[in-house]
Regions:
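Helix-loop-helix junctions within the multi-pass membrane cores of secondary transporters/permeases
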Residues: 25-62, 88-89, 108-165, 309-407
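Residue-level signature of catalytic and energy-coupling elements of molecular machines
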Residues: 45, 65, 152, 224, ...
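Hydrophobic, aromatic-rich alpha-helical transmembrane segments
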Residues: 37-48, 74, 78-82, 86, ...
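Juxtamembrane transmembrane-helix boundary signature
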Residues: 88-109
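Membrane-embedded alpha-helical modules
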Residues: 122-235, 239, 368-485
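Hydrophobic/aromatic residues within the transmembrane alpha-helices of Major Facilitator Superfamily
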Residues: 49-56, 91-94, 98, 173, ...
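Hydrophobic alpha-helical transmembrane segments
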Residues: 22-34, 77-85, 104-114, 225, ...
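Helix-loop-helix hairpins and the membrane-proximal interhelical loops
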Residues: 3-6, 10-80, 191-196, 230-326, ...
Length: 485
């Protein structure tokens, strides 16, 4: 779609007070500066609906990732997780619309959810894990207020930023393959295809068919490919289950059938289930690394996404500054705390916001529309819960593949870049630890730069990270040597 040529309306400070709005416009126009940004109410509504359709899959994927047990063996209910995911996305996106006044939508970040499920919950209770999420959100907000967020962003080498995104992509894809039953732990090998070296059962075949269908839709450039693929995979699943073709026990998350009506009251049972105590059992070093990993997981993509979508909407100037940038970054950080209190994990800006911009969205009104759609989903939990876990898992693999596309930005001919990137990317899924991947990449980057005599290119922040990560890897031997373990 050809976009209109719009000059930037303001500088980096907050949204739109200086936008030129003709007299006689409606309060809606005046508040969101719709005319001032060359848009219309119809375009904003269309953009908001498009953005929702592009990211509605999160209502299925986030509960799937957070479905595991915590250290006490407790799990979070699927209906409660769907409610929490919809509520947190609605509140965060509405805040971005009404306060930030920019066309950005937020929802649970799969990278943050992956850290919570794989590294945090196994060490503590889910309530304590959500407390960690709140802490991560508060830290992000403090970094924005103090101006340190941008400083830290600039201190991390760009190749490592891409590597972290790629590594999390592989990590998320592995979760998807495992949830679908496509990959199992083998008896004589770490992993194997299916439970015995082969695919078994209709559900896993439905996963494979859904995965291919989404990839084909994306290759054709079909809008909302992920959501369409999920719907397309769910319909035959419901039919096969209704015809008793599949044993209900084969479905990983229960048979795809509607229990009761399509409409129900939201389940807020996990809302407010947050604890900030009891972290001493896992150790201060572990707590610090977990919080640091959560910050990393939700840190890097947000600013790039905000600036990227702002540029696409022609709101950013030549220096990448855009109306409402400071508020948008702060709300993105607040999303971490909102997600933790809601029980949905940290909220972050979704790159799918660009789909709404492509339909003409230029203001926060489109975000309000998207947020209202998420709010409406609170009352349609049964329809969301009917989607089989195997079908939703296909979307996880697709998201992982999309994150891996950052590989095109890496200079693979430069070993000083390629080796740290490689270690970051592969160690995350191989160790099932995002922290370990980041640590390996940082240490390798500093070591190789030092070996090449380019110490000045490293920077104080990277040196500090290297020391922290060396201690992280050597913590067990150090504790044994000191006799404290």
């Amino acid at each position: 779609m050809t976009q209109q040529s719009l000059e930037p309306r303001t500088v980096a400070d907050d949204a739109g007070d200086k936008s030129r709005v003709p007299a006689g416009r409606s309060w809606l126009d005046r508040y969101f500066h719709i005319s001032g940004r060359g848009s219309t109410v119809a375009r904003e509504v269309r953009g908001g609906v498009t953005t929702f359709m592009a990211m509605a899959y999160i209502l299925l994927l986030n509960p799937l990732i957070l479905s595991g047990e915590d250290a006490a063996g407790n799990t979070l209910g699927q209906k409660a997780l769907i409610t929490a995911t919809a509520f947190a996305a609605a509140l965060s996106t509405l805040l971005m619309g009404f306060v930030g006044k920019v066309p950005l939508a937020l929802a649970a970040g799969l990278s943050v959810s992956g850290v919570l499920a794989s590294q945090v919950a196994p060490e503590m209770t889910w309530a304590q894990a959500m407390g960690m999420c709140v802490m991560y959100g508060v830290i992000i907000m403090l970094l924005v207020v103090t101006g340190l967020r941008e400083m830290i962003m600039n201190a991390i080498p760009l190749p490592l930023k891409h590597a972290i995104t790629m590594g999390i992509g592989l990590f998320v894809a592995l979760i998807g393959f495992h949830k679908a039953g496509f990959v199992h732990q083998g008896k004589s090998t770490p992993v194997t295809l299916g439970p015995a070296g082969e695919l078994a059962g209709w559900p896993v075949l439905l996963f494979a068919a859904t995965l291919l269908a989404i990839f084909m839709l994306q290759a054709r450039g079909i809008p909302g490919a992920i959501l369409l693929g999920i719907v397309g995979g769910t319909l035959p699943a419901v039919l096969l289950n209704a015809l008793d073709v599949i044993d209900p026990g084969q479905w990983a998350s229960g048979a795809p059938e509607l229990h009761g009506g399509a409409v129900s009251m939201p389940d807020f049972s996990v809302f407010g289930q947050v604890e900030f105590g009891g972290w001493g059992d896992v150790g201060a070093m572990t707590v610090g690394m977990i919080v640091f990993t959560l910050v990393l997981a939700g840190f890097f993509d947000a600013m790039a996404t905000i600036i990227g979508v702002g540029t696409e909407a022609e709101l950013a100037d030549a220096r990448g500054r855009m109306p409402g940038l400071s508020k948008a970054l702060f709300i993105d950080g607040a999303g971490g705390a909102i997600g933790g209190v809601s029980g949905a994990s940290g909220q972050t800006v979704f790159v799918e916001s660009a789909t709404g911009v492509g339909e003409g969205a230029r203001t926060g009104l489109s975000s309000v529309v998207t947020g209202l759609f998420f709010a409406a989903c609170l009352f349609f939990t049964p329809l969301t819960a009917i989607v089989p876990g195997e079908v939703a898992a296909a979307a996880l693999v697709v998201i992982g593949a999309m994150m891996m596309m950052n590989a095109r930005h890496v200079d693979w001919s430069d070993r000083a870049t390629a080796i740290p990137v490689f270690l970051t990317v592969v160690i995350m899924p191989f160790t099932y630890s995002i922290t370990a991947g980041v640590a390996a990449g940082v240490i390798a980057y500093v070591a190789i730069k030092t070996a090449r005599g380019k110490v000045r290119e490293i920077g104080a922040f990277m040196w500090a990270l290297t020391v922290i990560f060396v201690v992280y890897f050597a913590l067990n031997p150090i504790e044994s040597w000191l006799g404290v373990r």
